[in-house]
Amino acid sequence: EPRTPWDWV
């Protein structure tokens, strides 16, 4: 699945 910046915050 693609990762977005929201996954890292």
From Swiss-Prot:
Keyword check for Secreted: yes
Main location: secreted
Any GO BP annotation: defense response
GO CC entries: extracellular region
Tissue specificity as recorded in UniProt: Expressed by the skin glands.
Keywords carried by this UniProt record: Amphibian defense peptide, Secreted
Domain of life: Eukaryota
Compartments it resides in: Secreted
Residue ranges that the Swiss-Prot or TrEMBL entry lists as coiled coil: none
Family per similarity comment: Belongs to the frog skin active peptide (FSAP) family. Tryptophillin subfamily.
Task performed by this protein: Putative defense peptide.
Name of protein: Tryptophyllin-4
The species this protein was found in: Ascaphus truei
